């Protein structure tokens, strides 16, 4: 439950609620979303590297760099969508719900893949 729920409220409040709003006061909306999303992607370097190591996918510095880079890019792209939802809805509720759904699907997929066969 920590992955789907424990990080979402904190991350959405920090990134879309505080950072995006603060940057939106000093720069246009598009650049504020881009900066927020890039920082959101970079925030996930540690968890992505840990997931690659735990699942035996690191395979050396080159593979680790490629995997982390892909994870950061995907998370930053997701951040753009979450930021768009924040802007479009005027609320944190929509990005929180999408973030919970995304994290929950990832946790469910990991559980299905790693559970013992019956």
Predicted ranges, named:
Residues 1-118:
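Transmembrane helix-loop-helix hairpins at the membrane interface
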């Amino acid at each position: 439950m920590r992955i789907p729920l424990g990080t979402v409220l904190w991350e959405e409040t920090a990134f879309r609620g505080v950072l995006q709003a603060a940057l939106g006061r000093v720069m246009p909306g598009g650049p504020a979303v881009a900066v927020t999303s890039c920082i959101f992607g970079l925030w996930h370097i540690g968890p992505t590297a840990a997931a690659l190591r735990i699942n035996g996918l690191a395979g050396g510095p080159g593979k680790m760099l490629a995997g982390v880079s892909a994870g950061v890019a995907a998370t930053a792209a997701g951040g753009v969508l979450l930021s768009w939802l924040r802007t479009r809805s005027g609320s944190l509720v929509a990005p929180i719900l999408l973030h919970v759904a995304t994290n929950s699907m990832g946790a469910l997929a990991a559980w299905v893949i790693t559970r013992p066969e019956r």
